[in-house]
């Protein structure tokens, strides 16, 4: 069952690793010689580079081992998602899949912190722990690697209507927006917002931009308009744009759709 798989993957694994006596303290001692608690590089000394390289190798060994152990669970989740895109809708299935995956990333985040005693916060410094784990490609999602989630979503949305793409990115931005009160701002909520922001900025917003570009090319740039459509007819229901040139109408529709799917800062920059 799902609950049994979860218990083995996280609860039992945590028990096994924390019962390893001196293993974790030794691992953490090495990591702390290279990074602070938030994964930022410590003040450089003659041997800092050696410890950073050793820590990076341990990160890789740990995450690739987790990836191997969770391979069947990862494949099962993906298959269920693909089934739901057909039995429900691609938008509903994607929402469910994102929520489920964020929970798994959060659990992996917690395990990683307990093993290495650091919480690698997002940072663009090439010397940060975050960048070290981001470079570790796995089939499963982990704190530095959301690419498998993005790839699965994009694969499902590739053949979907543009509106479905917009519904997904719009929901993701709204669902994981800033909490309205401190009571709602739990550690998991903060982490989920971080995952959502990274997923949007690094993957889904560029994907959506490309989807709009393709639609503009198809319905505007390369569209053929019959001569009859060039005639200006009467205004309908008092709407000034109702008798506009067809391509102008379509352009306005696309702008409105983009505006609804994107946060204000991004739609204004367009």
Which residues does each PLM region occupy?
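Long alpha-helical rod scaffolds of large eukaryotic non-enzymatic complex subunits
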Residues: 1-270
């Amino acid at each position: 069952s799902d609950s049994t798989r979860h218990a083995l993957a996280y609860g039992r694994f945590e028990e096994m690793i924390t019962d390893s006596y001196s293993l974790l303290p030794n691992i953490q001692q090495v990591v702390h010689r290279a990074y602070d608690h938030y994964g930022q590089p410590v003040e450089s000394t003659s041997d800092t580079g050696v410890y950073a390289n050793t820590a990076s190798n341990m990160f890789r060994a740990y995450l690739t081992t987790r990836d191997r152990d969770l391979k069947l669970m990862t494949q099962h989740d993906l298959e269920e998602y693909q089934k739901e895109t057909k039995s429900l809708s691609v938008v509903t299935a994607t929402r469910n899949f994102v929520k489920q995956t964020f929970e798994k990333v959060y659990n992996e985040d917690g395990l990683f912190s307990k093993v290495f005693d650091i919480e690698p916060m997002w940072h663009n410094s090439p010397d940060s722990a975050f960048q070290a784990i981001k470079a570790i490609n796995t089939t499963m999602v982990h704190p530095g690697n959301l690419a498998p989630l993005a790839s699965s979503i994009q694969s499902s949305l590739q053949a979907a209507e543009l509106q479905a793409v917009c519904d997904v990115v719009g929901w993701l931005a709204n669902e994981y927006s800033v909490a309205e009160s401190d009571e709602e701002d739990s550690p998991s909520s903060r982490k989920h917002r971080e995952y959502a922001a990274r997923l949007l900025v690094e993957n889904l917003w560029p994907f959506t931009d490309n989807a709009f570009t393709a639609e503009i090319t198809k319905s505007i740039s390369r569209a053929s308009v019959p001569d009859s459509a060039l005639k200006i007819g009467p205004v309908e229901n008092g709407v000034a744009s109702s008798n506009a040139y067809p391509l102008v109408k379509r352009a306005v529709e696309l702008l409105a759709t983009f505006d609804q799917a994107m946060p204000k800062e991004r739609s204004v920059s367009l």
